[in-house]
Amino acid sequence: MKYKIIYMGTPHYAREILQTLVEAEDMDVSLVLTQPDRPVGRKKVLTPPPVKVLAQEHGIDVLQPNRLSEEGIKEAIKSQNPDFIIVAAFGQILPQSILDIAPCINLHASLLPQYRGASPVQQSLLNGDEKTGVTSMLMEAGLDTGPMLEKIEFVIPKEMRLFALMEQLTRDACMLTLSTVRNFETITPEAQDESQASLCKKIKKSDGQIDFEDAEIIYNKYRAFEGWPGIFAVNGTKFDEVILLESGTTHTAGEILSFDEESVLVGCSRGALKIGILQPASKKVMTARAYCVGRGKKVGDNIL
């Protein structure tokens, strides 16, 4: 027997799950819905979502509505007579009219009810969590509030950053998708405990600003904001190759404690960091030592 699937998703995470469904012999994906093409980069080149590119490679029909309530969308989904609608990082809330067509299964990259919303993976790193995971759930009208079906947990290594964690959770989500569909008839959905629920918002560029107050908070921002927005000081200087040295000591915020080859050790009001790379606003990337030498900064001075 083949499961008839309609798939909704947009970014790379969702693309990998679609790839898994396409490769599975017992899954038949007949229709894909994804976000409209968007302008990307400085030149604003109109770019299709990763899910659309993959679907077209496999000859699967693609719809890109601005809203799922648009005319003809519900009818297009219904006409496929799906067994399941599978949703992963789609970017729109499903209206009840679509939720009623078939069981809608969402793959959410957190251990629900923790971190409902747009940035669960970043949030787990920001909070320095020891573990995270992926949850498959039955969708309802609320945001990530539906009954849970299955979970895979993952223990986060202390030095792991966003890209590596996202890669791990994507692999787990692919496995979980197949497991949940295949075992759906025997799974007892479990209601989420509302007293344990938390929400996470979309990341903004300003979230990456740091102030050398708390080394552990800065290090967790460095882990969570890999790629974008990164971490940067109020004057726009960006920091990379950051290591948490200690979290209990007390220093003057931003004080240069010492140099270690091409890196600089910087004190925070709580704790200390080792920084390997700096990039002043609108300037080239350079080693931390080169930055300090070029500005005549020595031990005891403020890094900025």
From Swiss-Prot:
Entry keyword set: Protein biosynthesis, Transferase
Binding site for (6S)-5,6,7,8-tetrahydrofolate: 110-113
Molecular function GO terms recorded: methionyl-tRNA formyltransferase activity
NCBIfam families given in the database record: fmt
GO cellular component entries: cytosol
General function of this protein: Attaches a formyl group to the free amino group of methionyl-tRNA(fMet). The formyl group appears to play a dual role in the initiator identity of N-formylmethionyl-tRNA by promoting its recognition by IF2 and preventing the misappropriation of this tRNA by the elongation apparatus.
Catalytic activity: L-methionyl-tRNA(fMet) + (6R)-10-formyltetrahydrofolate = N-formyl-L-methionyl-tRNA(fMet) + (6S)-5,6,7,8-tetrahydrofolate + H(+)
Protein name from the UniProt record: Methionyl-tRNA formyltransferase
Claim: Protein biosynthesis is one of the keywords in the record: yes
Family: Belongs to the Fmt family.
Source organism of the structure: Sulfurovum sp. (strain NBC37-1)
This protein's record includes keyword Protein biosynthesis: yes
Upper lineage: Bacteria, Pseudomonadati, Campylobacterota, Epsilonproteobacteria, Campylobacterales
EC number: 2.1.2.9
